[in-house]
Swiss-Prot record:
Name the record gives this protein: Transaldolase
Predominant place of localization: nucleus
Family: Belongs to the transaldolase family. Type 1 subfamily.
List of residues that carry Phosphoserine: 237, 256
Positions bearing N6-acetyllysine: 115, 219, 269, 286, 321
Gene Ontology molecular function terms on file: carbohydrate binding; identical protein binding; monosaccharide binding; transaldolase activity
Known partners and oligomeric status: Homodimer. Interacts with KPNA1 and KPNA4.
Length: 337
């Protein structure tokens, strides 16, 4: 009745095939867009939350966050900060109703060079999840992969049992430092690396296997697997499905709803390109990085230096936009009285 097994297999979507060897994660704050793709986990960031917070469907969450900020009181700045943390957690809690795994919630990018402030803010976010009845085991705290961010991740993991997702990761130096810090997961970016090469070199298009972002994640994956690091490698920031397919077999891949939709409609055959076995044969050598060596090696990578600082600025700008939006909603009525 349902056709031959061969025919059925042939019609299997690229998304379903990908799920056989890679954990698929949805990269969105728009949790209504998650259902049909059935991801294991989800990731958010300040830009995605800002976009979702402006959608009519999510105004109740925004109102709830505002009410929470006001209820805690204190100076206006404090109320806004509390409202934003609450908003991130409300979105995370709604997403968790739709997925079996974990959600990633980001610490304010403006704290990217302040280890202690990142640790404190992360603990506050976990506390808010706890108030909402959600265990820290279902949360990944996202931190910028600066030296300070990586050390904050190490402290959160070792001293507080808080799982971290190191983001804005563009260089091999960042990946090595994260592995040595023993964080739960890293998010090496793919598309933003491609963007830099397209903007700064004469080559304007790449085959997926030659894509500089794909090559970066492949090298990081091979290094982690060759030397037995437990940290999960989650490729992030994709510009097209070709990049995703070229990283099939990576531990996790976090993908926007738009590209998840394209993979769902695509029935071409997909085979893993990354594997632990292949990683063992790579010619990578193990290195150790203290702070000085990290800063030097990272600084040697012009693309990574520019994209890390650009990424922090972009997330910070969107955090400021979100603050302004909430400030207007929280205080303009009062000021207008």
């Amino acid at each position: 009745m349902s056709g031959s097994p061969v025919k059925r297999q042939r019609m299997e979507s690229a998304l379903d095939q990908l799920k056989q060897f890679t954990t698929v994660v949805a990269d969105t704050g728009d949790f209504n867009a998650i259902d049909e793709y059935k991801p294991q986990d989800a990731t958010t960031n300040p830009s995605l939350i800002l976009a979702a917070a402006q959608m009519p469907a999510y105004q109740e969450l925004v109102e709830e966050a505002i009410a929470y900020g006001k209820k805690l009181g204190g100076p206006q700045e404090e109320q806004i900060k509390n409202a934003i943390d609450k908003l991130f957690v409300l979105f995370g809690a709604e997403i968790l109703k739709k997925i079996p795994g974990r959600v990633s919630t980001e610490v304010d990018a403006r704290l990217s060079f302040d280890k202690d402030a990142m640790v404190a803010r992360a603990r506050r976010i976990i506390e808010l999840y706890k108030e909402a009845g959600i265990s820290k085991d279902r949360i990944l705290i996202k931190l910028s992969s600066t030296w300070e961010g990586i050390q904050a991740g190490k402290e959160l993991e070792e001293q507080h049992g808080i799982h971290c997702n190191m983001t804005l990761l563009f260089s091999f130096a960042q990946a090595v430092a994260c592995a040595e810090a023993g964080v739960t997961l890293i998010s090496p970016f793919v598309g933003r690396i491609l963007d830099w090469h397209v903007a700064n070199t004469d080559k304007k298009s790449y085959e997926p296997q030659e894509d500089p972002g794909v090559k970066s994640v492949t090298k990081i994956y091979n290094y982690y697997k060759k030397f037995g690091y437990k940290t999960i490698v989650m490729g992030a920031s994709f510009r097209n499905t070709g990049e995703i397919k070229a990283l099939a077999g990576c531990d996790f891949l976090t993908i926007s709803p738009k590209l998840l939709g394209e993979l769902l409609k695509d029935s071409s055959k997909l085979a893993p390109t990354l594997s632990v076995k292949a990683a063992q044969t790579s010619d990578l050598e193990k290195i150790h990085l203290d702070e000085k060596a990290f800063r030097w090696l990272h600084n040697e990578d012009q693309m990574a230096v520019e994209k890390l600082s650009d990424g922090i600025r972009k997330f910070a700008a969107d955090a400021i936009k979100l603050e302004r939006m909430l400030t207007e909603r929280m205080f303009s009525a009062e000021n207008g009285k």
